[in-house]
């Protein structure tokens, strides 16, 4: 880093922190609150990073490097203090300095709110990638939105999810810097006026539009143990007009701030509820706001050192993290053609060389389609551009497949019918250089299904880059005990080359090493047990299986199947079974505000937890916990204490998953389907060290048209009994039909996620889990094998693949 570590000692660290207490938060050590001290430490760390940050950015200009721009609606960063200190190499030093000053470092860490910039795996992947790009010295920038209230805070009231604003910015964000000099206009609505210029060229001008300003906020991203500090730039929406003083003076106080409110709504929350038309419109505005400000900024940075746009595609590579930023393709064409007056073909060639697209799903509801009516209202010029892109594209399609209207329909950006839609995934494929899936299985699946027709046209465009995770946060930070054991046993090289973890496999036969390993897991479980009791009031047994299912609540992730399994084992306990192995089942995750079935599943989990946890028969055998407001910092506490990782999505529906990797990295065993990255994990770790169950994707595809879930119940009385108990899981004062929609979903609506089809196999897999857990030596061996085999799944390896195979950029570390 830019500072000399040899000159920093505990005393100089103490002085630096105290100086920030006096001059930064304007307190004395005696009057400062814990939050004041946290802010002082964070500001001290920021100052240490500042010179390195400036040096990094200057070097990018001086060397005229090709830059990578990673655009994402989400960056699920978690907390930054410990992560930044670890990467700077100052974690232990700061801890010691604070201890000398009489402050508890762990208490300070708790003062930091998780950054409200993401929700699920998409955002956490983006955060891991930022860490790896900086660690590898890649000239990269993240671009996202600065949400005032994040996704939402989740409370549980009477078993139901209740959403409230995530006030993550209430006390400010000590890591961000407002860049007021970077303020870009973004235009919505209006109408397009066409005219002819002196050269006979058509000129399009958007008139009568609504203008909103994009204000830049920068967050530093330090690499691990190197001199790189990259930037995450976040945009906040602001009104062009601001406070309307004349309205205020006439008593119209609402109108005086109306423009401010309407503009600010764009970056108010992540993913506004799109089950209503207003929410759909706001989402579209969010996505365009992000790409418009970002592309204006990219071009500003490029033109700072280049007089023409001739080398734009040689100096810029843009990665679209899912379809949310795919509008960037149309925006780049808008700027190059309308403002820079490039010839269409030149602009299109440049654009398609710059952009690349990561697909994260094949689920129809997650593949964005915008109604033509909405799109034409909000972005009229961009609709014209997309029509032109599509017309030229379909001309090529017709040349390759003359007279094949089915092929034209399949490959068109515009979906025809009684209602017309713009297919953003198709735009993303047509307008990019490379399209990648995020696991080998998923990449093959999108080539065989979703983008099959495109693969025929662009056989070399589709590649795979399997997802990964950063071992710095997910092992060194979150599991200090295990990382300390690894450091003593195999060295620290695994922190930057995770494949070095394979050295631990040879130690699996060492009984002394296994004993240490097992002891660490128990200590982590004891810590988590204490926290569960403190925060949730549930007493759990740290000697039980800690069985964790923590991720976004969605039917395809099958939390429902898990709670049906819990009901089955609870029934076994009530019937006097003596073969139940004590188990603590931990759920966590948020449901989208408009997703009624997911929210009802949360209610079912909480009702079952209430019933089970209050039954004396189950006291020592089964506990169920739903941990509200699942977030990165909570995952960092749960994952190191987990014995069993639930990765049970319907085969073919989870693109990759990264939670599976985090659990395995911390020594948990996986129970899962052959889906997403589970398949590659089985190859690297060994299928024998996992609990694989369920139908394969091809079996589900074959079964889909003739699947009859009622027949499963008819043939299997214990499954029918489970469903009967679901209906009885209501509490005394609740509607007797409360959970009827869940049973209807399974029996009368075709069980679209094949819960009942896989349930028997899932129960059998859990029986295998229970048998192995009663053999702690064997369980611990498999735990070690999981850690030893997970080395491929580093985000450093993922980013190296992107850099080599997609971006064509070099790394300096």
UniProtKB/Swiss-Prot annotation:
Q: Which cofactor does it need?
A: pyridoxal 5'-phosphate
Keyword Methyltransferase attributed = no
Alphabetized, the UniProt keywords read:
Allosteric enzyme, Carbohydrate metabolism, Glycogen metabolism, Glycosyltransferase, Pyridoxal phosphate, Transferase
So what does this thing catalyse?
A: [(1->4)-alpha-D-glucosyl](n) + phosphate = [(1->4)-alpha-D-glucosyl](n-1) + alpha-D-glucose 1-phosphate
Which GO biological process categories is it annotated with? glycogen catabolic process
Q: Which GO terms describe its cellular component?
A: cytoplasm
Against Pfam families, the record matches this protein to: Phosphorylase (PF00343)
Matching InterPro entries, A to Z? Glycg_phsphrylas, Glyco_trans_35, Pyridoxal_P_attach_site
User: According to the UniProt entry, what is the EC number of this protein?
Assistant: 2.4.1.1
GO MF term set: glycogen phosphorylase activity; pyridoxal phosphate binding
Modified sites of kind N6-(pyridoxal phosphate)lysine: 662
Q: What does this chain do?
A: Phosphorylase is an important allosteric enzyme in carbohydrate metabolism. Enzymes from different sources differ in their regulatory mechanisms and in their natural substrates. However, all known phosphorylases share catalytic and structural properties.
Q: According to its UniProt record, which protein family does this protein belong to?
A: Belongs to the glycogen phosphorylase family.
Protein name, UniProt field = Glycogen phosphorylase
* Gene symbol of the encoding locus: glgP
């Amino acid at each position: 880093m830019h500072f000399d570590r040899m000159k920093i000692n505990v005393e100089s660290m103490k002085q630096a922190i105290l100086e920030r207490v006096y001059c930064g938060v304007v307190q004395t050590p005696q009057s400062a609150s814990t939050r004041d001290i946290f802010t002082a430490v964070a500001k001290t760390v920021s100052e240490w990073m500042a010179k390195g940050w400036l040096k990094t950015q200057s070097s990018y200009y001086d060397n005229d490097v090709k830059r990578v721009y990673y655009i994402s609606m989400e960056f699920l960063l978690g907390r930054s203090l410990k992560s930044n200190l670890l990467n700077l190499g100052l974690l232990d030093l700061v801890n010691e300095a604070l201890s000398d000053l009489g402050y508890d470092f762990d208490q300070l860490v708790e003062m930091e709110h998780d950054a409200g910039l993401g929700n699920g795996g998409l955002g956490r992947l983006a955060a891991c990638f930022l860490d790896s790009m900086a660690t590898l010295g890649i000239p990269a920038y993240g671009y996202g939105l600065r949400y005032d209230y994040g996704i939402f805070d989740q409370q549980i009231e009477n078993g139901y999810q209740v959403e409230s604003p995530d006030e993550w910015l209430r006390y400010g964000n000590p890591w961000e810097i407002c860049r007021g000099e970077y303020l870009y206009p973004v235009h919505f609505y209006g109408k397009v006026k066409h005219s002819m210029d002196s050269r006979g060229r058509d000129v399009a001008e958007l008139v009568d539009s609504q203008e909103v300003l994009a204000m830049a906020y920068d967050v530093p991203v330090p690499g691990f143990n190197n001199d790189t500090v990259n930037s995450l730039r976040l945009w906040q929406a602001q009104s062009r007009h601001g406070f309307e003083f004349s309205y205020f003076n006439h008593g119209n106080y609402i109108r005086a701030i109306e423009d401010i409110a309407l503009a600010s709504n764009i970056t108010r929350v992540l993913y506004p509820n799109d089950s209503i038309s207003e929410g759909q419109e706001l989402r579209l505005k969010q996505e365009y706001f992000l790409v418009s400000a970002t592309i204006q900024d990219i071009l500003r940075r490029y033109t700072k050192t280049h007089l023409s746009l001739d080398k734009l595609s040689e100096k810029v590579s843009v990665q679209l993290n899912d379809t949310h930023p795919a509008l960037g393709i149309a925006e780049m064409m808008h700027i190059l053609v309308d403002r820079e007056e490039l010839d269409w073909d030149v602009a299109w060639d440049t654009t398609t060389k710059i952009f690349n697209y990561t697909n994260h799903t094949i689920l129809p509801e997650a593949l964005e389609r915008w109604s033509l009516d909405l799109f034409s209202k909000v972005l009229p010029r961009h609709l014209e551009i997309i029509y032109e892109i599509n017309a030229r594209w379909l001309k090529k399609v017709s040349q390759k497949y003359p007279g094949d209207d089915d092929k034209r329909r399949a490959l068109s950006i515009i979906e025809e019918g009684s209602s017309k839609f713009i297919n953003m995934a198709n735009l993303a494929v047509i307008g990019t250089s490379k399209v990648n899936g995020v696991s080998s299985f998923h990449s093959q699946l999108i080539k065989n299904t979703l983008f099959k027709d495109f693969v025929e046209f662009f056989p070399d465009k589709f590649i795979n880059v399997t997802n990964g995770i950063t071992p710095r946060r997910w092992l060194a930070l979150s599991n200090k005990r295990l990382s300390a054991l690894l450091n003593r046993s195999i060295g620290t090289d695994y922190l930057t080359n995770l494949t070095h973890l394979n050295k631990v496999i040879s130690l699996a036969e060492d009984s002394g090493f296994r004993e240490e390993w097992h002891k660490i897991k128990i200590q982590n479980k004891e810590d988590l047990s204490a926290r569960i009791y403190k925060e949730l009031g549930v007493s759990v047994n740290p000697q039980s299986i800690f069985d964790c299912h923590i991720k976004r609540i969605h039917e395809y992730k099958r939390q429902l199947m898990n709670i049906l399994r819990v009901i089955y084992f609870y029934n076994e306990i009530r019937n006097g079974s003596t073969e139940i192995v004590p188990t603590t089942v931990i759920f966590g995750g948020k449901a989208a505000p408009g997703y009624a079935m997911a929210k009802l599943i949360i209610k079912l989990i909480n009702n079952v937890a209430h019933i089970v946890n209050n039954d004396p028969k189950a006291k020592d055998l089964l506990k169920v916990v739903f941990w509200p407001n699942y977030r990165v910092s909570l995952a960092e506490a749960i994952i190191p204490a987990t014995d069993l990782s639930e990765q049970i999505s319907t085969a073919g529906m989870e693109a990759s998953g990264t939670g599976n990797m985090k659990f395995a990295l911390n020594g948990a065993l996986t129970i899962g389907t052959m889906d997403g990255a589970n398949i590659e994990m089985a190859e690297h770790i060994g299928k024998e060290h996992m609990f694989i169950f369920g139908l394969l994707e091809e079996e589900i595809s074959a079964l889909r048209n003739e699947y009859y879930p009622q027949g499963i119940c008819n043939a299997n009385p214990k499954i029918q009994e489970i469903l009967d108990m679901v209906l009885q899981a209501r509490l005394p004062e609740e509607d007797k039909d409360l959970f009827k929609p869940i049973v209807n979903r399974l029996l009368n609506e075709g069980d679209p996620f094949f819960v009942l089809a896989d349930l028997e196999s899932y129960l059998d897999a859990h029986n295998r889990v229970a048998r192995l857990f009663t053999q702690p030596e064997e369980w611990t061996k498999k735990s070690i094998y999981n850690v030893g085999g997970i080395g491929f799944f580093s985000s450093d390896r993922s980013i190296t693949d992107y850099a080599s195979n997609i971006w064509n950029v070099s790394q300096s570390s």
